[in-house]
Amino acid sequence: HLLQFNKMIKFETRKNAVPFYAFYGCYCGWGGQRRPKDATDRCCFVHDCCYGKLTKCNTKWDIYRYSLKSGYITCGKGTWCKEQICECDRVAAECLRRSLSTYKNEYMFYPKSRCRRPSETC
């Protein structure tokens, strides 16, 4: 669920998804195209790919179980879809934390029209 993903991002990075990640680069936020701009954008690209494999799941709106304890995100039990969505979100939030040192404010509201290089495939 998008609100749960936001909480994971905040837990890992201490930044709110909006405005820091919702419009970042070529892949963060709704949709994505061309090539990721940097490590942060690549986290979003991989997250999009992860969701893309879950074609039978309601990736943006399914509510799943998880906990935030002792510096770790742990996904809980649920349906196969809910567990997989949680894992996609957990991995992406942890990736965003690892990419904090290279986060660029210039990509924060990056116009998708400037994403020109050839697309990558998952």
Curated annotation (Swiss-Prot):
Summary of activators and inhibitors of this protein: Activated by heparin. Inhibited by its chaperone crotapotin.
One family name in Pfam for this protein: Phospholip_A2_1
Residues the record lists as binding Ca(2+): 27, 29, 31, 48
SUPFAM superfamilies the UniProt entry points to: Phospholipase A2, PLA2 (SSF48619)
Domain of life: Eukaryota
Disulfide bonds: 26-115, 28-44, 43-95, 49-122, 50-88, 57-81, 75-86
pH dependence: Optimum pH is 8.5.
Catalytic activity: a 1,2-diacyl-sn-glycero-3-phosphocholine + H2O = a 1-acyl-sn-glycero-3-phosphocholine + a fatty acid + H(+)
Record GO cellular component, one term: extracellular region
Tissues of expression: Expressed by the venom gland.
Cofactor mode of binding and number, as noted: Binds 1 Ca(2+) ion.
EC id: 3.1.1.4
Annotated thermal dependence: Optimum temperature is 18 degrees Celsius.
Active site positions, chain numbering: 47, 89
Essential cofactor(s): Ca(2+)
GO molecular function, one term: calcium ion binding
Database matches in PROSITE patterns: PA2_ASP, PA2_HIS
Function: Snake venom phospholipase A2 (PLA2) that shows moderate neurotoxic activity in isolated mouse phrenic nerve diaphragm but shows high neurotoxic activity in a chick biventer cervis preparation. Also shows a high bactericidal effect against both Gram-negative and Gram-positive bacteria. PLA2 catalyzes the calcium-dependent hydrolysis of the 2-acyl groups in 3-sn-phosphoglycerides.
Protein name: Basic phospholipase A2 F15
Source species of the chain: Crotalus durissus terrificus
